[in-house]
């Protein structure tokens, strides 16, 4: 529909703005009476909350990944201790004072209220005055309703007991928290209605110029996500509903989609053309690119001189940083860990020819290979062979699949101090990774990848899990294999497939491992562990079981409680 071709221009304006803090209110200075003068004013208002939503991903990502078993932020020499905040996430010992817990709550409710303000305004405007058809106007409102449901889904998964706010008119909102079931029902109703009001994707290509808009398949996939986790979130299984809706998406009932041909196509610089993307936040070097400029992509690699290895020295976002590393598969003395959970490098190595296991390299012309960074990282500078050095500058960096104090140790040497925990690590500890490409300065695709929130593979894996839980293991395996085939060479893929198409047995543990491989570092690991009943009971590197299951949800921060006397703290805190 022609009016939504204008969205690209609208996003260009909003994406340049940037979020300044979690407490911003975008309508403080401009009233609705004098703001909405043109059709483009309406479109800009609708998509302003999307820019905040993109920014807010960082808080969710930290809570989901650093409380799980696959990545961690251990102390690296004198770096990344930060008052113990990352250790508390790892050990599940967070408190009501932790800002990380507060940020997700405030970030989501800021976005919710932005959506509410816009929806209130849209309900008072005359669409004909702005030359919108009824269908077009309903689509606009459904954009904000779907985004609001996305925020509420995050809150339901993280805190379970939250207020329900649907308007700037406080009389229409709950005073305190509502029951999880009430919030679940609200999200479900909103999304089911929006699936009918939103446009379906046009054609069989990617989202193209309308990347960043919700469409029918995106809203339906949010429902799949909601139903998949219902048993934990409201105590009632919704796997049947999840499977039915996932199958509809795969059947093309909400638009035409297909898996990317390679594992990394969906993350590449031109992923607006990828048919696997259901919903993504647009990103561009000249506009907003939060996931590059901090905390996600930029901080999964060694610091400082890694830019020479990557060739992205002019990307304009300062030094790379080493916040995230793969949890180790080995002790400092080389003894392999044997825990069921964690050990991500070992889990990838189970299938030795996995393309993602290759050393990450930029190949030029907007191409890359591999996902992992390990061992010595060699590069050439002015015709001379060089290596990435430690950020402290005192030795060549050798990344190993272990955490400890390896300063002065060669690749095969064992340190005198064999302690391995969150407070005993260094810059050589742990493999690093590059999931979204960090292209070199000469590549036009540098920092251009859109952030993919929902992709077709998630729908396939969700359906596979539903079938597995029904006891239809072969059907589940076949579904997973449709995605997994692209991870291995064509002449070797048969030996890596799940039975009955290959020799690998699909068990519940393997299913959880496969979720971890396919969606590694995509901001969902905590939720997956909870669904498999492993988050509190599981054991992984430097992590023993929690004393009970109250840590499956986070507490309300002290500031949040003090701001509203009607709120009650979650049990166990």
Language model features with spans:
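C-terminal substrate/ligand-recognition segments
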Residues: 102, 363, 367-483
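An aromatic- and glycine-enriched ligand-binding surface/loop that stacks and positions planar moieties
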Residues: 20-83, 192, 213-405
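Long, intrinsically disordered, low-complexity segments
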Residues: 18-21, 39, 50, 79-81, ...
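Sec-dependent bacterial lipoprotein signal peptides
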Residues: 1-17
């Amino acid at each position: 529909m022609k009016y939504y071709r204008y969205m690209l221009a609208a996003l260009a304006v909003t994406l340049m703005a940037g979020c300044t803090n979690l407490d911003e209110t975008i309508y403080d200075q401009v009233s609705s009476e004098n703001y909405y003068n043109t059709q483009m004013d309406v479109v800009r208002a609708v998509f302003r909350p999307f820019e905040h939503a993109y920014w807010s991903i960082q808080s969710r990502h930290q809570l989901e990944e650093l409380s799980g078993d696959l990545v961690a932020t251990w102390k690296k020499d004198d770096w990344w201790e930060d008052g113990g905040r990352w250790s508390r996430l790892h050990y599940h010992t967070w408190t009501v004072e932790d800002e990380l817990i507060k940020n997700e709550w405030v970030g989501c409710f800021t976005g919710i209220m932005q959506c509410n303000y816009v929806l209130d305004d849209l309900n008072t405007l005359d669409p004909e005055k702005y030359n919108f058809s009824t269908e077009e106007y309903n689509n606009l409102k459904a954009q904000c309703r779907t985004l609001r449901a996305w925020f509420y889904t995050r809150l339901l998964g993280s805190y379970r007991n939250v207020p329900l706010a649907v308007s700037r008119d406080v009389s229409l909102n709950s005073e305190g928290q509502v029951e999880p079931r009430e919030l679940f029902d609200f999200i479900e109703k909103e999304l089911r209605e929006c699936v009918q009001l939103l446009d379906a994707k046009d054609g069989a290509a990617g989202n193209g110029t309308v990347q960043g808009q919700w469409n029918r398949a995106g809203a339906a996939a949010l429902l799949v996500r909601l139903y998949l986790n219902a048993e934990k979130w409201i105590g009632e299984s919704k796997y049947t509903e999840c499977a039915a809706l996932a199958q509809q998406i795969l059947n093309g009932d909400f638009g035409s989609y297909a898996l990317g041909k390679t594992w990394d196509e969906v993350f590449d610089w031109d992923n607006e053309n990828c048919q696997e993307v259901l919903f993504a936040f647009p990103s561009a070097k000249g506009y907003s690119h939060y996931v590059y400029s901090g905390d996600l992509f930029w901080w999964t690699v060694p610091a400082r001189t890694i830019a020479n290895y990557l060739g992205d020295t002019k990307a304009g976002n300062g030094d790379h940083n080493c916040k995230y590393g793969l949890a180790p598969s080995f002790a400092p003395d080389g003894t392999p860990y044997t825990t069921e959970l964690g050990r991500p490098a070992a889990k990838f190595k189970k299938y030795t020819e996995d393309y993602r296991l290759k050393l990450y390299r930029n190949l030029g012309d907007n191409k890359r290979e591999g996902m992992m960074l390990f061992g010595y990282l060699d590069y050439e500078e002015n015709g001379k062979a060089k290596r990435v050095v430690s950020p402290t500058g005192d030795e060549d960096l050798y990344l190993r699949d272990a955490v400890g104090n390896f300063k002065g140790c060669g690749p095969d040497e064992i340190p005198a101090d064999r302690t391995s925990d969150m407070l005993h690590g260094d810059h050589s500890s742990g493999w690093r990774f590059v999931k979204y490409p960090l292209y070199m300065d000469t590549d036009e695709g540098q920092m251009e990848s859109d952030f993919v929130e929902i992709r077709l593979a998630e729908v396939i894996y969700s359906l596979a899990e539903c079938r597995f839980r029904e006891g239809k293991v072969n059907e589940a395996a076949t579904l997973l294999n449709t995605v997994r085939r692209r991870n291995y060479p064509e002449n070797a893929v048969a030996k890596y497939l799940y039975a009955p198409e290959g020799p690998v047995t699909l068990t519940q543990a393997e299913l959880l491992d496969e979720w971890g491989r396919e969606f590694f570092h995509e901001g969902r690991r905590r939720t997956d562990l909870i669904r498999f009943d492993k988050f509190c009971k599981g054991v992984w590197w430097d992590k023993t079981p929690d004393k009970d299951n109250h840590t499956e949800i986070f507490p309300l921060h002290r500031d949040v409680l003090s701001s509203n006397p009607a709120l009650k703290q979650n049990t166990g805190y």
